[in-house]
From Swiss-Prot:
GN (gene name): clpX
CDD domains the UniProt entry points to: RecA-like_ClpX
Name of protein: ATP-dependent Clp protease ATP-binding subunit ClpX
GO cellular component, one term: HslUV protease complex
Subunit structure: Component of the ClpX-ClpP complex. Forms a hexameric ring that, in the presence of ATP, binds to fourteen ClpP subunits assembled into a disk-like structure with a central cavity, resembling the structure of eukaryotic proteasomes.
Superkingdom of source: Bacteria
Role noted for this protein: ATP-dependent specificity component of the Clp protease. It directs the protease to specific substrates. Can perform chaperone functions in the absence of ClpP.
Pfam families cross-referenced by the UniProt entry: AAA_2, ClpB_D2-small, zf-C4_ClpX
Location of the ClpX-type ZB domain: 1-50
Keyword tRNA processing: no
Organism: Haemophilus ducreyi (strain 35000HP / ATCC 700724)
Amino acid sequence: MAFEKEPHCSFCGKRRSEVDQLVEGCEGYICNDCIEESYVLLNGAEEPLIDDSQNDEKFFENVPTPHQIHAHLDDYVIGQEHAKKVLSVAVYNHYKRLRNALSHHQETNGVELGKSNILLIGPTGSGKTLLAETLARRLNVPFAVADATTLTQAGYVGEDVENVIQKLLMKCNFDAELAERGIIFIDEIDKITRKSESPSITRDVSGEGVQQALLKLIEGTVANINPQGSRKHPKGETIAVDTSKILFICGGAFAGLDKVVEARTHTQSGIGFAAELKKDKDREDLTSLFKQIEPEDLVKFGLIPELIGRLPVITPLQELDEAALIAILTKPKNAIITQYQALFKMEGVELKFTKDALTAIAQKSIVRKTGARGLRSIVENLLLDTMYDLPTLKNSQGITKITVGKGCVQNGDKPKMA
């Protein structure tokens, strides 16, 4: 299997192509995400990682409108216009709901507003995590990411589901009120589906058990969290967090869901087994199919109905094509190419990529099926030798300009130096 050949993080299991950096040790690897989490844990989040100066009233006054949220997403995320619009509205309404609860429902004449958690469906590298992270950054709220495949139900070996809340608390110096404004992104939610849509003895008990445990958090409960590493709570007393106030965004690739949707939408009524799917030539593309997703499709895929009911906002993300990947390399704020150009500029050297080189990078990512997530790894490997030699070469040869061409990507040619 490719997974066995490709180095992966010994802690979270993510492959090298799925992370920005993978550091090798004597007997394993650790990715940049796990390094960051470890740093926060070891340092006890001494300083709040977000601005905690706003009280509730001031915070809710400053919640951006859907148009403002969408505009901010445009700065960092290429494409996915429908998903951006859906997220902008859902997030805006979520914080209106919290504001209404704070006023004891006076703004709605006693009407309680339900919470609309979100399910993002899209292939690896389509921007699910980036969208959620960018939302949290714009709103200035705590943000935590959890991998559903590492979570276990009570009584099993692994990471307890409530550890997700602990991660969120770490991001705001264990301030429960700040955490309750936060956003939690649960990735790989599709990997904990049960094996059959019909409850039976053959189902994936552990997978469904994790779904049940997540359901409790997502629908709302008071979680009592042990604040490990907190200097605010040195005696180890638990912190109560009301999860009904936290916005949960779940994401997954849901490989094979298109076949479930297609079977429902294309099946023609007939006698006995006469119903059949349309031929491949009439098959709709993946994006079109995912726009037709219904809760019943997710049940057939293996999510429990109760969990689907707590994720009412379902939005598909498009698979990124060549043009979108090229745009991701160059256009957003903090674009990958811009970051490397800044690194080279610190050495007094101009870094350029030809159009053909950018196209080749995008094509390589498509072949690897890593989407936008794999772009940084490709560029990093492409420039590794150059960055290694650069400090020496610029002094000995007076290098001021480096150009990366198509051959560098496809054939391993060295960049041109001048």
